[in-house]
Amino acid sequence: MKGSLISSAIAEPYAQALMSVAQAHNLTEQFGDDCRSLIAILEESRDLQGLILSPVIKETDKKAVLRRMMGDRTSPYLLNFIMLLVDKRRIIFLEEICQQYLTLLRKLTNTVLAEVTSAKELSDRQCRAVTDKIKDLTGAQGVEIKTSVDPDLIGGVTIKVGSQVFDASLRGQLRRVSLSLGGTA
């Protein structure tokens, strides 16, 4: 289910259609929250992935499970969209469609996605400081942070925004010192 070129090409028009529905009903942020939840569930649940990917499981069964999983809190527009994906046999692209939707939402709201890797878990205060720094560097109105921990960094953080990487880690500083001294990192 991870994004290949083909799945991206299939997912993009569906994500744009979902964005059109969300904008028409002023639900862009709610759909964004629901997409984030769906992505998290799909990444965590092998059983749900198996259900979605299985050609043996009937569409009616897939719909019943998805309806139960989505619950009453989900917008009927989003639920209908997901049921349409099942009918069109495009439900296997649900995760990619949600990713593409979030990309469109970030463009719409002038928000950047920052992948922050640190040597240890960041506190709320540190996350706010990183968010403020990213806003200053990019001029974005909002920042969506995806954090991960890599003890090999020794200390500090690396921040990836789009194709730019800001390396403020101790490992990166040691590598730069080594290179400046004529060594190989």
Swiss-Prot record:
It is a peripheral membrane protein. Pfam families: OSCP (PF00213). Keywords: ATP synthesis, CF(1), Hydrogen ion transport, Ion transport, Membrane, Thylakoid, Transport. InterPro entries: ATP_synth_OSCP/delta_N_sf, ATPase_OSCP/d_CS, ATPase_OSCP/dsu. The keyword ATP-binding does not apply. It is found in: Cellular thylakoid membrane. GO terms for molecular function: proton-transporting ATP synthase activity, rotational mechanism. It comes from the Bacteria. F-type ATPases have 2 components, F(1) - the catalytic core - and F(0) - the membrane proton channel. F(1) has five subunits: alpha(3), beta(3), gamma(1), delta(1), epsilon(1). CF(0) has four main subunits: a(1), b(1), b'(1) and c(10-14). The alpha and beta chains form an alternating ring which encloses part of the gamma chain. F(1) is attached to F(0) by a central stalk formed by the gamma and epsilon chains, while a peripheral stalk is formed by the delta, b and b' chains. Belongs to the ATPase delta chain family. HAMAP family: ATP_synth_delta_bact. F(1)F(0) ATP synthase produces ATP from ADP in the presence of a proton or sodium gradient. F-type ATPases consist of two structural domains, F(1) containing the extramembraneous catalytic core and F(0) containing the membrane proton channel, linked together by a central stalk and a peripheral stalk. During catalysis, ATP synthesis in the catalytic domain of F(1) is coupled via a rotary mechanism of the central stalk subunits to proton translocation. This protein is part of the stalk that links CF(0) to CF(1). It either transmits conformational changes from CF(0) to CF(1) or is implicated in proton conduction. This is ATP synthase subunit delta. It comes from Rippkaea orientalis (strain PCC 8801 / RF-1). The lineage of its organism: Bacteria, Bacillati, Cyanobacteriota, Cyanophyceae, Oscillatoriophycideae.
